[in-house]
Amino acid sequence: MGRIRQTFIKRTGEELIEKFADKFTSDFEENKKAVEEVAMISTKPLRNRIAGYVTAKVKKMNA
């Protein structure tokens, strides 16, 4: 079983996908940079978790 993501991460990821859908791809490294550009995330681990969530959502949408 996988880890359950916090509501804050899910909510932020969903909002970023809605507003900036064209910036995100299925590549985690690119999404890290995109999250850093468009959102004011205070810590690196939080940025990485949000980028990971966005990456998973994009992969699901494209599958």
Swiss-Prot record:
PROSITE patterns: RIBOSOMAL_S17E (PS00712). InterPro entries: Ribosomal_eS17, Ribosomal_eS17_CS, Ribosomal_eS17_sf. It comes from the Archaea. GO terms for molecular function: structural constituent of ribosome. Keywords: Ribonucleoprotein, Ribosomal protein. GO terms for biological process: translation. One of its GO terms (cellular component) is ribonucleoprotein complex. Belongs to the eukaryotic ribosomal protein eS17 family. This is Small ribosomal subunit protein eS17. It comes from Methanococcus maripaludis (strain DSM 14266 / JCM 13030 / NBRC 101832 / S2 / LL). The gene is rps17e.
